[in-house]
């Protein structure tokens, strides 16, 4: 087992034994470098910390069942393939079919949890705020466009704020397990618009979920990625 995986698992065990210890947010590089055997990354907050915007019950199913399921599936699919010693980033960029779908969903969900905070909401500051104002005219205009992308994505998928190779901001939407790393873009923010992200709390009311989502966005973390 690789050293980084041993350190990661030790951190998870520490959280289990001492619930008062909170996990640190993972950077994009830390998520990219995860390797077999994959583990369910610890949340950077308590299971009930996102209430009343996202309920503990939703996290128990979304994180504890769906996210864990993608981790389990990936661990079952990868052994014996060319991706047995690959990083999660390499799996996303080079694999197809079930390995890609489950690998990307492990990455996407880990990133999504790290985009949220019980102390989130508000607006970005600094260089990110300037870039948003330059590209979209105002934060409210950006928020409206990102929300529109999230609401108009047909079926299941993800909406993303990314930075392209030229450092320009872009809002994209990706069906199913789509991940912008495949196109050489840097993810800054994502919103999970699979129904399992909100059905227990909002049923099929995706707009209501988006309203709550904005109250949780960790703009400090998004700004650091930018």
Where are these regions (language model features)?
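Feature for soluble, non-membrane regions of globular proteins
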Residues: 24-226
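Bacterial Sec-dependent N-terminal signal peptides
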Residues: 1-25
């Amino acid at each position: 087992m690789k050293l980084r995986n041993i350190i990661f698992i030790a951190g998870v065990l520490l959280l289990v034994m001492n619930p008062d210890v909170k996990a640190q947010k993972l950077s994009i590089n830390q998520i990219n470098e995860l390797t077999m055997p994959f583990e369910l990354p610890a949340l950077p907050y308590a299971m009930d910390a996102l209430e009343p915007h996202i309920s503990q019950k939703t996290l128990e199913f979304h994180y504890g069942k769906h996210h864990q399921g993608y981790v389990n599936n990936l661990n079952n699919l990868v052994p014996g393939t060319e991706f047995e010693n690959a990083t999660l980033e390499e799996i996303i960029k080079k694999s197809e079919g079930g390995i890609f779908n489950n690998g990307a969903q492990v990455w996407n969900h880990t990133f999504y949890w790290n985009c949220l905070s019980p102390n989130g909401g508000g607006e970005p500051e600094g260089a990110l705020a300037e870039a948003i104002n330059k590209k979209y005219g105002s934060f409210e205009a950006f928020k409206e466009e990102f929300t529109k992308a999230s609401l108009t994505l047909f079926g299941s998928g993800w909406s993303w704020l990314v930075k392209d190779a030229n450092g320009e901001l872009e809002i994209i939407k990706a069906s199913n397990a789509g991940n912008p790393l495949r196109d050489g873009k840097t993810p800054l923010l994502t919103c999970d618009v699979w129904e399992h992200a909100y059905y227990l709390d909002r049923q099929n009311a995706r707009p209501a979920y988006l309203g709550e989502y904005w109250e949780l966005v960790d703009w400090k973390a998004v700004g650091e990625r930018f």
